[in-house]
Amino acid sequence: MEQTTSTSTTSPAFAAARTQSAANMKQFADVFKKENSCTRRVMTALPEGQSEFRPHPSSKTAREVASIFSLGKGGMAAALTNNWQWPPQFPPTPATYADVVAAFDATTQAVEQALANTPSARLLETVPFFTGPKQMADVRVIDILWFMLHDSIHHRGQLSVYVRMTGGKVPSIYGPSGDEPWV
């Protein structure tokens, strides 16, 4: 007897994938909320008047680094809501650090709303995304979300160094910092 694979939306395999997608959506939403709370603490630890600090002439300013968080979350919301464009149309960097923080809050809310309203099956759909230097491929939405969150974590670490270099107090991130001991 020949074995066939069903691609019907009522097949057990499809139902299992849909259940897994729902679990992935919840896991991502939980981690996203925790990481964004921490990122906002790092952003607001930058001392007043230091948004144009850059540690090296080839480095971005603190304002430019902090604006990367909103760009990534804009991509997350677009991927979730089927508004993905490649190449992306990035908005200009906000003119003030207060505007950067406001954009961070707005894009956090947009992603949280998209996570709450997007069918979990969307996570398994693909969109074009870079996979290496001058390399593109179709990448699952869930993988884009994790990539962008990890990119945000990377830039949060970068910004925490700027906070330290400008005399700010670095908040605890995954454990105590020199400025926020736990004991």
What is the role of each PLM region?
Residues 2-11, 29, 33-43, 50-90, ...:
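Short, contiguous alpha-helical
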Residues 15-30, 59:
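Short, charged, low-complexity loops and linkers
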Residues 22-29, 97-101, 145-149:
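Active-site rim elements
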Residues 37, 41-45, 106-113, 117, ...:
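A generic structural signal for well-ordered alpha-helical segments enriched in polar/charged residues
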Residues 46-49, 120-121:
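Short, solvent-exposed, charged loop/turn and helix-capping segments
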Residues 78-119:
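Helix-adjacent hinge/juxtasegments
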Residues 117-134:
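Acidic catalytic patch
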